[in-house]
């Protein structure tokens, strides 16, 4: 049933439509009018809202969401109004208005065309203010969800009930969003408007307002909804391969942003039968994305199931899919083929190279690549296996070879392999290029014959061509470079007439450093023209060139200053400076003056223009009428074109004051016999040197036959005086300051007959003397010819002195300057490492030595200033010996030498940074461990300072206070505080522990070095731990810097007559009979073993070096076993100390024995060795003497040795080898007064002044039969060696030999008793060669 109100509204609406329709084509409708004017109106809560709408047509109300039209509070009445009731009015009444009624109230016509909608609606925003409710909607407990889209507008609808309320927008947890009027806008009728929402606005947002001191909040939770699909994948490899009957499992993974839902479906070949089962799940553990899984499973796959499997993912309008193909096979198989050809090529230096094969197989086989029959990935870390490919990183020449791929399916017993050959081509390399790259080129003497070499290597073998690039003959200002002018380069051959005359160009293949290289030699027959020789090596990979600056010089060393003569006052000073024009420029003369201890450079005015010649530039300096003030140091300065360095050549000029001549002695009358000869001397001094003129009877004497004027005419010599020669002789000396003269009368006696007789006698005498001299010359030549035929392989001091004298041996040794000569300019001398009686050793930096492209630290031996010719000859002889010996790892090797004139003689050898072995072992006494396990488990502890190191010294520097050097043996070491700081980088090395394996290794290496020296027929004669240097990587090297050893200050060398000798290390035959051989070196090696296994102890501790020591040594008494020795090591020592040199082992045998011991030690790690002196009570600290080993020796309880074991528990050692029946060996320790006392190993090692020169030689008597030395394991003492250096003073012979003081020798016995008492103390006549010929050990 329709009410009247509804009927009226309906009729009004119809009428309005008619009116609006009519008015649309005619007059325009006016907007409805509201009774409240403006855009907003504020009222208080609880009041009644009256609002009337007047319009020209029927209209309706639009109200806020919280105002319900069915509410009893709301009433709307409609009526006709206006003139004649032609207008429509509607009155809205809202009783007791509430805060949530706040909003837009609008009135609009019922039927309005879309285009006129805005014009037919009127609205006003009503604020219903309530102090207890500032927000229209309150969500204080549960936040309101707001959906948002990134990039679009987001409205936070925290509307307020009064426009005057201040609202703050906050984002959990601590952010505050402040309106900026652009991106974030506050509107009291809408809330906060964010124009371009991002992910940052996702989360909990809170609007806060404070009213009357009370805080109100309303919460909103933004929710981003998206349909984005990030990625879709099938985790199974593509394509999928299966055997028939197996199960197929495909996992499809879809990744989406948060708040996204997807639909995942599958399509597959046999989908109609629905054989597949699908499981789905979602992983939301990721904070940034959702991961959806769909797993498809098909059991018992058949051939009909092969084909394409597709996974489709849809989210709203977004769609993605992924597919894979499935292959079904009946059985396993492998097929492999070459991808290209069997022989492959690549280039060295390539970042990576992929070696791959075409492989089809199922199931996936195991892949192994072999290189030359060995697993490639185990051979080098640069080989990586990727699928069926082998990746070679950073290709090198060593990567060439045969590569085999092994494919295997072991479960199906299917195997296949295929081999390919890889050739690695190498760009040519010229090995001389590194040396020729130095900025300062070489100079070649004018007219000399020169040989230029170019050695190239590459794969394939490169071809070498020579080119000539001439220098501009007018060149004077610029350097002659390949690019400095535009002159053409000419290819050379043997018949070329370009440049210098070519004698030959040859090429040959040579194996150098294990590689087959092409060596080309260009021989210049006559060096006349300066230019650049260019060596070009090329192959298919590339081309490389080497420029050889060939500068001709007519000046020695390219720079020379010449003084015509030293002028006197008033004369002219004439100097000339000549430099090579291609190497130097800006030539000028300067005068050097010293002012306030500073050298000042003063230019010299009025210098002449330089004269440019074909090869050089000459600048002359002439100072006319010099005075004494012109004395000084004149220097020619020139700038090196290549280095830019200014070079000075100095000449000291001393102007002498003029002095009138004066005679040193006047002439005196004298009488001579006829036919004899006479000489008249007239020596005069003066400045300048006076000119002498001779007169006879006032007539000037000229030189003629029979009358000879000596140098400067100061001597007049008359041959066969005749009667006519009698008269007055007058000499006159004249210079600018005056003249002086003297005269004498010469009387001639005798007759002509007598003179004829004298002439005949003189003639016969001359003939006889000539014949005698001729016969003597022939005899000497015959003797030299026979001696020169002696074989030269027995060289140096090792040659039998009875065959050829030592000096003659050394003179025969050749010195190859082309191989060993090193430019002094490339050698930078550093700190002094040590000095000796007449030589010194300095540390230096050598650039390019041994063709190395880098700077290398070396040791340089040189003479001190003022060295004599014999000392120079000694060092040169030593250099020749070094060149003869050759190279070996365990010998300090020669690197080069500087022998050319213009500088000091220098011998360059290897530098060993860790010093000598003796000092090193002493520093390790608190860090010695029997095996590596103990060393690895030791507790870290603060390193204890040695005595003497507490005052600011480092533990490393024990050689600072020692007479022994860390760089060589025996010389005094120069160390400053800065030197100490430079050695701090080695502290870590000195803190590392040392084990039994290290001691055996040192012994083994020294034996190897001595084996090498003995093979070169070299005898060391001073083999000791002080002459063993420790290099990097625990390598020891034998050395003996003989010229630098100051044996006069080293207590290891005992004076014997006028010579000091290392007696403790010398074999008996060397002491008594002066016999040196390889077997005497073996004796010294045994003493060296004793030093090593006593950790640097001094041999024969507590034993005086006197005649009693000689006698005991001759009787077979030997040293006890050292503290850290094993029975096998001690047996080796005793073998080396055999009385008969022939019974001592050869060094080759020692290498074999120690090699076996070293290998055994590595395998057993030291656990099965029993140190001989380890038979001590672990905690008592006392030393016991024990009997020799017996059968039940090892049944006794033995306490652990005093090694650092890394544990506080007692450790016992059990030997792993059998002992022979051992004879008893007498030891020196048994004779000492207090056998159990602790000896200081730093007593003077050799401290006895033995015999005077009057005692001629020792006596050696073989009164007892020879017996083989066996081990006696009787331990008589355990001396704890300690201290830093040899500090005690040398002691002297016992009273039985007579006491000898340093100042004066006094003997208390008469000669007969003396000869009987000290027959053992006579020195050999001369041991100077020990000093002269050493380093490396000879």
From Swiss-Prot:
<dbReference type="GO" id="GO:0018108">
    <property type="term" value="P:peptidyl-tyrosine phosphorylation"/>
</dbReference>
<feature type="glycosylation site" description="N-linked (GlcNAc...) asparagine">
    <location>
        <position position="597"/>
    </location>
</feature>
<feature type="glycosylation site" description="N-linked (GlcNAc...) asparagine">
    <location>
        <position position="620"/>
    </location>
</feature>
<dbReference type="InterPro" id="IPR020635">
    <property type="entry name" value="Tyr_kinase_cat_dom"/>
</dbReference>
<dbReference type="GO" id="GO:0015629">
    <property type="term" value="C:actin cytoskeleton"/>
</dbReference>
<dbReference type="GO" id="GO:0002548">
    <property type="term" value="P:monocyte chemotaxis"/>
</dbReference>
<keyword id="KW-0732">Signal</keyword>
<dbReference type="InterPro" id="IPR013783">
    <property type="entry name" value="Ig-like_fold"/>
</dbReference>
<dbReference type="InterPro" id="IPR007110">
    <property type="entry name" value="Ig-like_dom"/>
</dbReference>
<dbReference type="InterPro" id="IPR013151">
    <property type="entry name" value="Immunoglobulin_dom"/>
</dbReference>
<feature type="disulfide bond">
    <location>
        <begin position="158"/>
        <end position="207"/>
    </location>
</feature>
<feature type="domain" description="Ig-like C2-type 7">
    <location>
        <begin position="661"/>
        <end position="747"/>
    </location>
</feature>
<keyword id="KW-0418">Kinase</keyword>
<dbReference type="InterPro" id="IPR001245">
    <property type="entry name" value="Ser-Thr/Tyr_kinase_cat_dom"/>
</dbReference>
<comment type="similarity">
    <text>Belongs to the protein kinase superfamily. Tyr protein kinase family. CSF-1/PDGF receptor subfamily.</text>
</comment>
<feature type="binding site">
    <location>
        <position position="861"/>
    </location>
    <ligand>
        <name>ATP</name>
    </ligand>
</feature>
<dbReference type="InterPro" id="IPR041348">
    <property type="entry name" value="VEGFR-2_TMD"/>
</dbReference>
<dbReference type="GO" id="GO:0035924">
    <property type="term" value="P:cellular response to vascular endothelial growth factor stimulus"/>
</dbReference>
<dbReference type="InterPro" id="IPR003599">
    <property type="entry name" value="Ig_sub"/>
</dbReference>
<feature type="glycosylation site" description="N-linked (GlcNAc...) asparagine">
    <location>
        <position position="474"/>
    </location>
</feature>
<dbReference type="GO" id="GO:0005925">
    <property type="term" value="C:focal adhesion"/>
</dbReference>
<feature type="glycosylation site" description="N-linked (GlcNAc...) asparagine">
    <location>
        <position position="402"/>
    </location>
</feature>
<dbReference type="Pfam" id="PF22971">
    <property type="entry name" value="Ig_VEGFR-1-like_5th"/>
</dbReference>
<dbReference type="InterPro" id="IPR001824">
    <property type="entry name" value="Tyr_kinase_rcpt_3_CS"/>
</dbReference>
<dbReference type="Pfam" id="PF07714">
    <property type="entry name" value="PK_Tyr_Ser-Thr"/>
</dbReference>
<dbReference type="GO" id="GO:0005021">
    <property type="term" value="F:vascular endothelial growth factor receptor activity"/>
</dbReference>
<dbReference type="GO" id="GO:0016477">
    <property type="term" value="P:cell migration"/>
</dbReference>
<feature type="glycosylation site" description="N-linked (GlcNAc...) asparagine">
    <location>
        <position position="547"/>
    </location>
</feature>
<dbReference type="InterPro" id="IPR008266">
    <property type="entry name" value="Tyr_kinase_AS"/>
</dbReference>
<feature type="modified residue" description="Phosphotyrosine; by autocatalysis">
    <location>
        <position position="914"/>
    </location>
</feature>
<feature type="disulfide bond">
    <location>
        <begin position="682"/>
        <end position="731"/>
    </location>
</feature>
<dbReference type="GO" id="GO:0036323">
    <property type="term" value="P:vascular endothelial growth factor receptor-1 signaling pathway"/>
</dbReference>
<keyword id="KW-0808">Transferase</keyword>
<feature type="disulfide bond">
    <location>
        <begin position="454"/>
        <end position="535"/>
    </location>
</feature>
<keyword id="KW-0393">Immunoglobulin domain</keyword>
<dbReference type="Pfam" id="PF00047">
    <property type="entry name" value="ig"/>
</dbReference>
<dbReference type="GO" id="GO:0005524">
    <property type="term" value="F:ATP binding"/>
</dbReference>
<feature type="glycosylation site" description="N-linked (GlcNAc...) asparagine">
    <location>
        <position position="251"/>
    </location>
</feature>
<dbReference type="InterPro" id="IPR036179">
    <property type="entry name" value="Ig-like_dom_sf"/>
</dbReference>
<dbReference type="InterPro" id="IPR013106">
    <property type="entry name" value="Ig_V-set"/>
</dbReference>
<feature type="modified residue" description="Phosphotyrosine; by autocatalysis">
    <location>
        <position position="1213"/>
    </location>
</feature>
<dbReference type="GO" id="GO:0019838">
    <property type="term" value="F:growth factor binding"/>
</dbReference>
């Amino acid at each position: 049933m329709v009410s009247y109100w509804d009927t009226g509204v309906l009729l009004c609406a119809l009428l309005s439509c008619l009116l609006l329709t009519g008015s649309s084509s005619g007059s325009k409708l006016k907007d409805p009018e509201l009774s409240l004017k403006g855009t907003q109106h504020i009222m208080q809560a609880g009041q009644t809202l009256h609002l009337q709408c007047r319009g020209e047509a029927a209209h309706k109300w639009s109200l806020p969401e919280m105002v319900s039209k069915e509410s009893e509070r709301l009433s709307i009445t409609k009526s006709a109004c206006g003139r004649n009731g032609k207008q429509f009015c509607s009155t809205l009444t809202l009783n007791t208005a509430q805060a949530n009624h706040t909003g837009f109230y609008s009135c609009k016509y019922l039927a309005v065309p879309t285009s006129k909608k805005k014009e037919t609606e009127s609205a006003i925003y009503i604020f219903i203010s309530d102090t207890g409710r500032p927000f229209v909607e309150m969500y204080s407990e549960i936040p309101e969800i707001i959906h948002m889209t990134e990039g679009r507008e987001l409205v936070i609808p925290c509307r307020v009930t009064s426009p005057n309320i201040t609202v703050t927008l906050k984002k959990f947890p601590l952010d505050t969003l402040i309106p900026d009027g652009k991106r974030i806008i506050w509107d009291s009728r809408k809330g906060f408007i964010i124009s371009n929402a991002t992910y940052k606005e996702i989360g909990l947002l809170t609007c806060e307002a404070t009213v009357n001191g009370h805080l109100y909040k309303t919460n909103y939770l933004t929710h981003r909804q998206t349909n984005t699909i990030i990625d879709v994948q099938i985790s199974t490899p593509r394509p999928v391969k299966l055997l028939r009957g197996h199960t197929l499992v495909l996992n499809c993974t879809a990744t989406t942003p948060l708040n996204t839902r997807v639909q995942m479906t599958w399509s597959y070949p046999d989908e109609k039968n629905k054989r597949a089962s699908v499981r789905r799940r979602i992983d939301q553990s990721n904070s940034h994305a959702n991961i959806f899984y769909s797993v498809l499973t098909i059991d018992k796959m058949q051939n009909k199931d092969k084909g394409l499997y597709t996974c489709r993912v849809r989210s709203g309008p977004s769609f993605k899919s992924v597919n894979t193909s499935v292959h079904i096979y009946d059985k396993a198989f492998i097929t492999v083929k070459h991808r290209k050809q069997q022989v492959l090529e690549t280039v060295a230096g390539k970042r990576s190279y992929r070696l791959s094969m075409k492989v089809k197989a199922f199931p996936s086989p195991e892949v192994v690549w072999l290189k030359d029959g060995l697993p490639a990935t185990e051979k080098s870390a640069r080989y990586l296996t990727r699928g069926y490919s082998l990746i070679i990183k950073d290709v090198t020449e060593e990567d060439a070879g045969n590569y085999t791929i092994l494919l295997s399916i072991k479960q199906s017993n299917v195997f296949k392999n295929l081999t390919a050959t890889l050739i690695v081509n190498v760009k040519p390399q010229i090995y001389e290029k590194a040396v020729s790259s130095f900025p300062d080129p070489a100079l070649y003497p004018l007219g000399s014959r020169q040989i230029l070499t170019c050695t190239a290597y590459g794969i394939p073998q490169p071809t070498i061509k020579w080119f000539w690039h001439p220098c501009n003959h007018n060149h004077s200002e610029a350097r002659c470079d390949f690019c400095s002018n535009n002159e053409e380069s000419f290819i050379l051959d043997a018949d070329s007439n370009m440049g210098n005359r070519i004698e030959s160009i040859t090429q040959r293949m040579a194996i150098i450093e294990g590689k087959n290289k092409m060596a080309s030699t260009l021989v210049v027959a006559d060096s006349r023209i300066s230019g650049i020789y260019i060596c070009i090596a090329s192959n298919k990979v590339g081309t490389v060139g080497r420029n050889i600056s060939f500068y001709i010089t007519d000046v020695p060393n390219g720079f020379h200053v010449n003084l015509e003569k030293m002028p006197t006052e008033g004369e002219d000073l004439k100097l000339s400076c000549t430099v090579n024009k291609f190497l130097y420029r800006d030539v000028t003369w300067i005068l050097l003056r010293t002012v306030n201890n500073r050298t000042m450079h003063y230019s010299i005015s009025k210098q002449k223009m330089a004269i440019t010649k074909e090869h050089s530039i000459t600048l002359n300096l002439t100072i006319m009428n010099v005075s004494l003030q012109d004395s000084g140091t004149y220097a020619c300065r020139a700038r090196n074109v290549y280095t830019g360095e200014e070079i000075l050549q100095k000449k000291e000029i001393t102007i002498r004051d003029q002095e009138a001549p004066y005679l040193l002695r006047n002439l005196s009358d004298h009488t001579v016999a006829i036919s004899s000869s006479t000489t008249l001397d007239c020596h005069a001094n003066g400045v300048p040197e006076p000119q002498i003129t001779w007169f006879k009877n006032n007539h000037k004497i000229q030189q003629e036959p029979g009358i000879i004027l000596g140098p400067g005419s100061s001597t007049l010599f008359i041959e066969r005086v005749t009667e006519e020669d009698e008269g007055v002789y007058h000499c006159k000396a004249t210079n600018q300051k005056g003249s002086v003269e003297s005269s004498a009368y010469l009387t001639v006696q005798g007759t002509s007959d007598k003179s004829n007789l004298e002439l005949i006698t003189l003639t016969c005498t001359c003939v006889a003397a000539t014949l005698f001299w001729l016969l003597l010359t022939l005899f000497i030549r015959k003797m030299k010819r026979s001696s020169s035929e002696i074989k030269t392989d027995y060289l140096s001091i090792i040659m039998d002195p009875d065959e050829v004298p030592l000096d003659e041996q050394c003179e025969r040794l050749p010195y190859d300057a082309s191989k060993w000569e090193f430019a002094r300019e490339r050698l930078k001398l550093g700190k002094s490492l040590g000095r000796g009686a007449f030589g010194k050793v300095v540390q230096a930096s050598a650039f390019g030595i041994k063709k190395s492209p880098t700077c290398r630290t070396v040791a340089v031996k040189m003479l001190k200033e003022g060295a004599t010719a014999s000392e120079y000859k000694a060092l040169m002889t030593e250099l020749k010996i070094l060149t003869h010996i050759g190279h070996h790892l365990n010998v300090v090797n020669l690197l080069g030498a500087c022998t050319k004139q213009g500088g000091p003689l220098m011998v360059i050898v290897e530098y060993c940074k860790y010093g000598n072995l003796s000092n090193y072992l002493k520093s390790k006494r608190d860090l010695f461990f029997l095996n590596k396990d103990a060393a690895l488990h030791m507790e870290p502890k603060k390193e204890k300072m040695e005595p003497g190191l507490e005052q600011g010294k480092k533990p490393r520097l024990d050689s600072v206070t020692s007479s022994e050097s860390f760089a060589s043996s025996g010389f005094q070491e120069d160390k400053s505080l800065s030197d100490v700081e430079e050695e701090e980088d080695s502290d870590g090395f000195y803190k590392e522990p040392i084990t039994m394996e290290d001691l055996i290794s040192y012994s083994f290496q020294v034996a190897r070095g001595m084996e090498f020296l003995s093979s070169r027929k070299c005898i060391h004669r001073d083999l000791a731990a002080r002459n063993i240097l420790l290099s990097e990587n625990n390598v020891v090297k034998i050395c003996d810097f003989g010229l630098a050893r100051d044996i006069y200050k080293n207590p290891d060398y005992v004076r014997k007559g006028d010579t000091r000798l290392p007696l403790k290390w010398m074999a008996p035959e060397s002491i008594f009979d002066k016999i040196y051989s390889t077997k005497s070196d073996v004796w010294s090696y045994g003493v060296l073993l004793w030093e090593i296994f006593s950790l640097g102890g001094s041999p024969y501790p507590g034993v005086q070096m006197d005649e009693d020591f000689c006698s005991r040594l001759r009787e077979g008494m030997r040293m006890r076993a050292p503290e850290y020795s094993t029975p096998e090591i001690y047996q080796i020592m005793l073998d080396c100390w055999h009385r008969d040199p022939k019974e001592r082992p050869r060094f080759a045998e020692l290498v074999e024995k120690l090699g076996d011991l070293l290998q055994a030690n590595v395998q057993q790690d030291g656990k099965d060795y029993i140190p001989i002196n380890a038979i001590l009570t672990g905690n008592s600290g006392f030393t016991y003497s024990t009997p020799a080993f017996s059968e039940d020796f090892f049944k006794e309880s033995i306490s652990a040795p005093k090694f650092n074991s890394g544990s506080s528990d007692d450790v016992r050692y059990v030997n792993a080898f059998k002992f022979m029946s051992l004879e008893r060996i007498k030891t020196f320790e048994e004779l000492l007064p207090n056998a159990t006392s602790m000896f200081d190993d730093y007593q003077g090692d050799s401290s006895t002044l033995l015999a005077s020169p009057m005692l001629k030689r020792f006596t050696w008597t073989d009164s007892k039969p020879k017996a083989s030395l066996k081990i006696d394991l009787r331990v008589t003492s355990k001396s704890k060696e300690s201290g830093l250096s040899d500090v005690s003073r040398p002691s002297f012979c016992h009273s039985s030999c007579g006491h000898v003081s340093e100042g004066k020798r006094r003997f208390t016995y008469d000669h007969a008793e003396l000869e009987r008492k000290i027959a053992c103390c006579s020195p050999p006549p001369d041991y100077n060669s020990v000093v002269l010929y050493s380093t490396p050990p000879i």
